[in-house]
């Protein structure tokens, strides 16, 4: 999860987030190299007294500054497209959870079970227990098995919302009348926090998301106790 004054991304918990962090580093390095080159050229222009007043064209330079940007764009586009395909691909999910956004709470339905559904509201600050996080704790957590592919179906009952959990690399819009899907896979157990990431009204910032990833045995015991 995030901590105060954090400058980087949250620790990756899913394969998708690991790929996104690698892509971030890859793209950031390209941006750094381009920025360094531009600053170097600007410094040369400001410090050197040599000028070419008679130069009308330079075919070699024009060829380079046409081909080089195209090559850089390809280096960015190829890994980006690969990650996009990975995020859309869902192979044999073991569980499907339907998520509905409301003003201003989330409701969840485990579609593989006959009667396993609940609403998830933020716990008010005056009801928090010691050690709990302000504006992030909920009364009903989403319990899911770790290390298994899970499909999330996401929609909304009223206005636009967005279901986002940064450490899992997830951000999917909840649109009324439309079902979007996302894949959830966690590499380790724990609590993972997120929030609604689309302005949805006056209490937009009071729609936290808490995923509790547990081993499969614990998930089976939890689901049996909830039915």
From Swiss-Prot:
One of its GO terms (biological process) is ATP synthesis coupled electron transport. The chain crosses the membrane at residues 15-45, 60-87. Residues 1-14, 88-227 are mitochondrial intermembrane. Keywords: Copper, Electron transport, Magnesium, Membrane, Metal-binding, Mitochondrion, Mitochondrion inner membrane, Phosphoprotein, Respiratory chain, Translocase, Transmembrane, Transmembrane helix, Transport. It is found in: Mitochondrion inner membrane. Its cofactor is Cu cation. Binds a dinuclear copper A center per subunit. Cu cation A2 binds at residues 196, 198, 200, 204. It catalyses: 4 Fe(II)-[cytochrome c] + O2 + 8 H(+)(in) = 4 Fe(III)-[cytochrome c] + 2 H2O + 4 H(+)(out). The keyword Transmembrane applies. Its EC number is 7.1.1.9. Cu cation A1 binds at residues 161, 196, 200, 207. Component of the cytochrome c oxidase (complex IV, CIV), a multisubunit enzyme composed of 14 subunits. The complex is composed of a catalytic core of 3 subunits MT-CO1, MT-CO2 and MT-CO3, encoded in the mitochondrial DNA, and 11 supernumerary subunits COX4I, COX5A, COX5B, COX6A, COX6B, COX6C, COX7A, COX7B, COX7C, COX8 and NDUFA4, which are encoded in the nuclear genome. Belongs to the cytochrome c oxidase subunit 2 family. This is Cytochrome c oxidase subunit 2. It comes from Leggadina forresti.
